[in-house]
């Protein structure tokens, strides 16, 4: 049984162990403080992309409202903890549940659409949220934004390193949860619906029910990512939650790999990690404004043209190549004997 668990979830555990070690490496001076901050960004955007991948990768539905629901979760959690004095656990639960409930209501209307019409409808919802963040200044502080603090649990105030480890544990837990969901009967129904809605209906699958399920998961993950953003970055403002962010998260799952669990994490590392950690240190071009956008745009085109299955599959292809070469070498040895 343990062997089966390790075979299925071992890669998620290894990822978690690597990430958990980063605060220790930073305290030893082996990595920079800014690098740890960048990996925090990779984690919460990876969580958001994991939810969007359920919607797009497994259900075939596209949403451009991701940033709006992230912002909703971020603002709500910051307001409840800083202004209302709620414990972090309660504010996190409420800040996931309310955006998810709103997402279900939005889905009841918008999920009767498909393709670009659905994308435009979800984009409109995100823009409504963004305008609310700007105009409802008596709650959101308008363009100044809202400040928040690292989370606290049962009276224990976390600092940045403890918050980072908490986010890693959440990430690994959600990867395991999503893996189980995808391999459940609901996950199989989503894949059937993605392949052919007509065939799914013929099999008795309630399309609206399963579309709402996928949409609510994507919304919940987006809200959770926004909460983690608010309490790790410790500030949220309207200009963060724009269309560009939704497109970047969409790029994450395209680059990382659709219909995979590790793909969103790989994509988040590439889309958010490389521009923050590596590109600024490049000679000559490192300080060019907009370099990250150019890099991500080129990479999306390259991946779509030459590696449509996503960068996460490179590891498996390299493994196959090595096994092929090793096997070929052994074959030659036998012939020589």
Segments predicted by a language model, with ranges:
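Transmembrane alpha-helices and adjacent helix-loop boundaries
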Residues: 1-337
């Amino acid at each position: 049984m343990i062997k089966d668990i390790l075979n299925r979830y071992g890669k998620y555990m290894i990822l978690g162990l690597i990430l958990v070690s980063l605060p220790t490496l930073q305290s030893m001076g082996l990595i920079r403080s800014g690098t740890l901050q960048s990996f925090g960004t990779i984690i919460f955007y990876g969580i958001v992309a994991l939810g969007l991948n359920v919607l797009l990768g497994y259900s075939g539905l596209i949403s451009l409202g991701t940033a709006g629901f992230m912002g909703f979760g971020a603002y709500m959690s910051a307001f409840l903890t800083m202004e209302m004095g709620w414990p972090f656990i309660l504010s996190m639960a409420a800040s996931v549940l309310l955006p998810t409930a709103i997402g279900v209501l939005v889905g009841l209307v918008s999920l009767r659409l498909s393709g670009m019409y659905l994308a435009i409808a979800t984009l409109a919802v995100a823009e409504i949220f963004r305008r609310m963040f700007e105009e409802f200044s008596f709650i959101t502080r308008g363009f100044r934004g809202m400040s928040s603090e690292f989370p606290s649990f049962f009276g224990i105030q976390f600092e940045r390193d403890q918050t980072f480890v908490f986010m890693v544990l959440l990430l690994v837990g959600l990867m395991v949860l999503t893996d189980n969901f995808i391999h459940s009967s609901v996950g199989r129904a989503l894949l059937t619906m993605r392949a052919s809605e007509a065939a799914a209906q013929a099999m008795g699958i309630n399309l609206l029910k399963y579309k709402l399920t996928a949409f609510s998961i994507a919304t919940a993950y987006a809200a959770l990512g926004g909460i983690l953003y608010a309490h790790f970055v410790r500030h949220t403002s309207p200009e963060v939650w724009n269309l560009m962010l939704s497109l970047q998260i969409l790029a994450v799952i395209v680059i990382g790999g659709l219909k995979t669990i590790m793909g969103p994490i790989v994509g988040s590392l590439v889309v958010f990690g490389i521009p923050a950690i590596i590109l600024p240190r490049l000679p000559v071009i490192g300080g060019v404004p907009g370099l990250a956008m150019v890099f991500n745009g080129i990479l999306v085109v390259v991946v779509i043209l030459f590696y449509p299955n996503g960068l996460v599959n490179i590891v498996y292809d390299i493994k196959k190549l090595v096994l092929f070469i090793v096997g070929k070498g052994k074959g030659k040895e036998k012939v020589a004997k």
